[in-house]
Amino acid sequence: MVQNISSPQAKPELGKLSPEHICPNCGHQGLHIFYEVRNVPVHSCLMMPSQEEAINFPCGDLVLGFCDHCGFITNVEFDSKWSAYAPNYEDQQSFSPTFNKFARDLANNLVAKYDLHNKDIIEIGCSKGDFLILLCELGNNRGVGIDPSVVPGRVESEAADRVTFIQEYYSASHAKYVGDFICCRHTLEHIQPTAEFVSTVRQSIGERKDTAFFLEIPNNTRVLQDLAFEDIYYEHCSYFSPGALARVFRASGFEVTDLYLAYDDQYLLIEAKPVDTTSDKIYPLEETVAQVAEDVKHFTRNIQTKLDNWRLNLQKWKAENQRVVVWGSGSKCVAFLTTLDTIDKIEYVVDINPHRHGKFIPGVGKQIMSPEFLKDYQPDKIIVMNSIYCDEIQQMLQQMGVSTELVPL
């Protein structure tokens, strides 16, 4: 249960060096502890059927450690026993027109770039299968999706009979599923032994040097520079800047063929090919470890002010009896409410995903409402968990006759 959460603590400069912790990304001994939030839900997207179950959801501690050898950041208190991804894990984003356009544009680019026509495609961490099925539709491809939370049949498509879903965690036992193209989107940040994971993919590919590997994760440079505390939560135990990601790929036997940002710089994307010996090529986006250290210092110096400002605003709106709603019930919402310890300041949370409606948010206990709920509620303010969706939200509100102020994070 989330209660009496200690205030997040940002340590001076790089934070205290913790010599007992080993970086899972490069093996270096010693991490600098620079940010702590205690007693947060260990999952953000497991949908709870009742408020009681949601309130009594297990909690853990979030303690970020920075590696001054490779630039990687990890939650040193992360315990993999809580990695209970299952069909009730609901992170499907394809109900958003904005996200759909991004996914379709990305898929079209990959199909064109790698000539993905009549090919075998593997997706590690495929969620409900939206992106894998899209790739198979666009290029008449065959697909295998590996994810413990997959729900076969959730996505209707003419390509469904060409896609096989395996409801398991990816491991070396899946080496036979390699194909012509491997993709992995928003999965690596949930895995703490990151070097081991990337190496497992490389070993699975073996000598098939034409197999490309595409991976997409959150861009931690933006998180640090923008003080995006809502993107720091227990499920995400691994945080990558572009340089840290490229370095672990090279160390695992991949040549980086492209490295870039997308989705308003929120996402970090990497493309790679297996090689015996990597080159010395460095991409412009790659920062040095010293630059990551400066971003960490910026975060520690300024995060408390941002958190205090949000607390003051929420308290002020509550005192004024303003109706304040959160739009977006996923991980950002859970991090926002629990980090600030202001669950009581928000009455309702809405979400566009119909599979979330009526369910309860883990650790928070709020029931998730559909956007149509706002027609009657008529909120004074809507706090938007991701500003990239403001335009589509405003359009929906106008169609529903809801006049309110959008407050993006």
Residue ranges and their predicted role:
Residues 25-32, 242-259:
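A SAM-dependent methyltransferase catalytic signature shared across enzymes that methylate proteins
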Residues 55-155, 167, 233, 238, ...:
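Extended interfacial segments that mediate partner engagement and assembly in macromolecular machines
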